[in-house]
Amino acid sequence: MNEKPVLGIQDIQNLLPHRYPFLLVDKILSYDLNTRSVVAQKNVTINEPFFAGHFPGAPIMPGVLILEALAQAAGVLLGIILENDRDKKIALFLGIQKAKFRQPVKPGDVLTLKAEFSLISAKGGKAFAQAFVGSQVVAEGELSFVLVKKESI
């Protein structure tokens, strides 16, 4: 599944502070401000730095990085929503509840990252997020974010 993005890597870098090797979203396939949802994609390649040690001979993407990719996808949507305050505020990943890892993610997989916010306020937000490889859910959880002034970090 190599769909045309609505936001490419340059747009994502304008919305997120992350950079290689920690930028874990390659493109945004869709977003909807009414449903407060986003669909993103991460192409998982054997060249990812974490595969050198996780695990030699049987590489799998660390689950915590799948959750981080989900948080970054949700963070892109928060960046779009923050439009007028983007230069002043930043969303920080605050926590995860009910995280589940269902399948391993391997080199060559395409991760589809989906998040839908149940709450967005001036202080932060909460989203349910799922990562897929094809139609299989590989990870999911409830993500929490806090909005802080950029100058405070």
Curated annotation (Swiss-Prot):
Family annotation (CDD domains): FabZ (cd01288)
Enzyme class at the top of the EC tree: lyase
Lipid biosynthesis in keyword set: yes
UniProt catalytic activity: a (3R)-hydroxyacyl-[ACP] = a (2E)-enoyl-[ACP] + H2O
Cellular localization per UniProt: Cytoplasm
Major localisation: cytoplasm
Gene3D superfamilies referenced in this protein's UniProt entry, alphabetically: Hotdog Thioesterase (3.10.129.10)
GO cellular component: cytoplasm; membrane
Pfam family, one: FabA
Residues in coiled coil: none
GO molecular function: (3R)-hydroxyacyl-[acyl-carrier-protein] dehydratase activity
InterPro entries: FabA_FabZ, FabZ, HotDog_dom_sf
Record-linked NCBIfam families: fabZ, PRK00006.1
Record protein name field: 3-hydroxyacyl-[acyl-carrier-protein] dehydratase FabZ
The gene coding this protein: fabZ
